[in-house]
Regions:
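A short glycine-rich, Lys/Arg-flanked "PGG" loop and its adjoining helix->strand segment in the class I
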Residues: 168-182
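Class I SAM-dependent methyltransferase SAM/SAH-binding core
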Residues: 94-97, 101-148
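Conserved class I S-adenosyl-L-methionine
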Residues: 180-210
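A SAM-dependent methyltransferase catalytic signature shared across enzymes that methylate proteins
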Residues: 21-23, 210-225, 246-257
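Class I SAM-dependent methyltransferase Rossmann-like catalytic core
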Residues: 55-81
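A short acidic, Gly/Pro-enriched loop at the edge of an enzyme's catalytic core
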Residues: 146-158
Length: 281
């Protein structure tokens, strides 16, 4: 039988049907109205709204590539920059990772915040299965970031969004009065060496404007910093990197394999991200 979920993490959650609080009873999360949500054998819980999610999230193959690439430590610098931004305002007690995938970025934050508990929310059940095992003080939930989040109002000290969609209104609702949102987005130079040779999508030049438009009606910008590292990757790592992200939706497996085979055996790849923090209005 799976161990109990972190009680303080469960306390953050809310029923996706009636928004009441949830408690763990046996192998399920239950609200006072009797709505019950079973815990999967892999450890995660599904808290989708009536009607389900608007999309299924990342595929099993994309999630496997992400777990392999992040597990190899290639994005350690991104996690470090994220954790620094999280801790700038003091150590949080509660952390919510929206679109958190396999939970590896959240795990890095929790390692640096020993008093905190965390919840990964992701639309992909494949990601949630891995995130459920990502850290002893974390739990994983399958949820839709574009609907009302299954999280209590004013309950979370930090919300993380790393290369994932942002729901400004719901983020503002779930943050505590002095809580902060930490957003990581790709900078213009991100993966620049691979865009031409592999036919990847370039970073949208209007990304900063779109970010402000989506968040600033609900949240106040507080800080901004950039982290840039240059990795040296072999072809297998490049294929995994491309396979884990949005580029995988635009390239078939044979197309990607052929393009990667034309690269040098080892390739310098720039990882450039902007890390921004926001507070409640």
């Amino acid at each position: 039988m799976s161990p109990s979920l972190p009680a303080r993490a469960v306390a953050l959650l809310a029923c996706p049907v009636c928004a009441a609080g949830l408690t763990e009873v046996g192998g399920a999360l239950v609200c006072a109205s009797g709505h019950s949500f079973d815990r999967a054998k892999q450890g995660h819980v599904t808290l989708l709204p009536p009607g389900g999610a608007r999309h299924d999230g990342d595929s099993a193959a994309m999630v496997a590539d992400r777990a392999a690439f992040l597990g190899a430590g290639h994005y350690a610098g991104v996690t470090e920059a994220l954790a620094e931004a999280v801790l700038d305002a003091g150590e949080p007690e509660t952390v919510l990772d929206l679109g958190g995938g396999t939970g590896q970025h959240l795990a890095g934050v929790l390692d640096r915040a020993p008093g905190a508990v965390g919840v990964v929310l992701d639309a992909s059940r494949y990601a949630a299965r891995r995130a459920a095992r990502s850290h002893p003080r974390a739990m994983a939930v399958v949820a839709d970031s574009w609907s009302r989040l299954p999280v209590g109002s004013a309950s979370v000290d930090r919300v993380l969004v790393v290369f994932a969609p942002r729901n400004g209104a719901e983020t503002a609702r779930v943050l505590t009065p002095h809580g902060q949102l930490v957003v990581v987005t790709p900078a213009a130079a991100h993966l620049g060496e691979l865009i031409g040779p592999l036919g990847l999508l370039s970073v949208d030049p209007d990304k900063t404007t779109r970010l402000a438009d989506s968040l600033e009606p609900h949240l106040v910008p507080l800080s901004e910093r950039r982290r840039e590292d240059v990795l040296v990757l072999d072809r297998a790592a490049v294929a995994t990197l491309v396979g884990m992200g949005p580029h995988a939706r635009h390239l078939s497996v044979p197309e990607l394999a052929e393009a990667v085979s034309r690269l040098p055996e080892r390739v310098p790849v720039t990882v450039a991200v902007d890390v921004r923090t926001y507070g409640r209005r």
